[in-house]
């Protein structure tokens, strides 16, 4: 395969929420610096584009999950996956990031060259199979922590003898029909807490299995304080105010439960 060399100031790996945020900051604060965002998949969004399971939504409010520089203007502060994708697309358009994102470009390796004081990054164009070597002063790893090829699947004894369907949320077929069926959800983490209420609307019976007891807090998906303040104050100011409040309350809760 042919190897072409390119020199950049910054290389960003991943066009999910972190990579898009990094690009927006570069365009705003470092407009004269050169950079590219390499995304191995064919679309932006990362987790929010990959996961298609029922009820996919943010686990935290969008005032804290969203960007500090771009207010979240929807009524619901707990957002669905499609709404988050819209938010990210707006950010890409507003900050002209499309020309910076290289889709279907998989980063194969990254090595620090001590002699040149540069990162040497090998990139594969998955569509053409052509390989490139890029060099940069800085490397931003925004690839997240999920393995996109397959999710974690424990080896359950006897699973091969099970006559029903075993579905992993990470590879949930959009055509999956669970109406009037009995469903067992293994685990009680954020994904399970999202899926169970949604499939319970149509399934005959839904049972969640958990190994360790946990606490659930019932919270509204609309922030009434934020909606009230937006009637009198600029939305950008309200967004920053609610963001500060929520971060403070989350830190306070975290410290209390550890006490």
Model-flagged regions — what are they?
Residues 47, 111, 218-219:
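Short Asp/Glu-rich motifs
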């Amino acid at each position: 395969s042919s190897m072409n060399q390119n020199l950049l100031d910054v290389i960003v790996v991943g066009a999910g929420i972190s990579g898009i945020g990094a690009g927006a900051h570069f365009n705003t604060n470092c407009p004269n610096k050169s950079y590219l965002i390499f995304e191995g998949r064919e679309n932006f969004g990362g987790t929010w584009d990959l996961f298609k399971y029922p009820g996919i939504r943010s686990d935290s409010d969008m005032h804290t999950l969203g960007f500090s520089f771009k207010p979240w203007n929807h009524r619901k502060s707990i957002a669905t996956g499609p709404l988050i994708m819209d938010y990210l697309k707006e950010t890409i358009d507003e900050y002209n990031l499309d020309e910076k994102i290289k889709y279907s470009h998989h980063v194969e390796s990254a090595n620090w060259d001590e002699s040149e004081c540069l990162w040497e990054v090998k990139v594969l164009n998955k569509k053409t199979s052509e390989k490139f070597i890029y060099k940069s002063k800085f490397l931003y790893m925004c690839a997240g922590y999920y393995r996109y090829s397959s999710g974690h699947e424990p080896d359950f004894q006897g699973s091969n003898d099970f006559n029903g369907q075993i579905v992993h949320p990470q590879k949930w077929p959009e055509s999956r029909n669970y109406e009037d069926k009995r469903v067992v959800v293994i685990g009680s983490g954020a994904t399970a807490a999202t899926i169970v209420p949604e499939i319970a609307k149509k399934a005959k019976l839904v049972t969640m299995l958990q190994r360790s007891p946990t606490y659930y807090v019932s919270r509204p998906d609309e922030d009434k304080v934020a909606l009230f303040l937006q009637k009198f104050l600029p939305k950008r100011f309200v967004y920053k105010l609610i963001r500060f409040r929520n971060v403070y309350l989350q830190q306070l809760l975290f410290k209390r439960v550890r006490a």
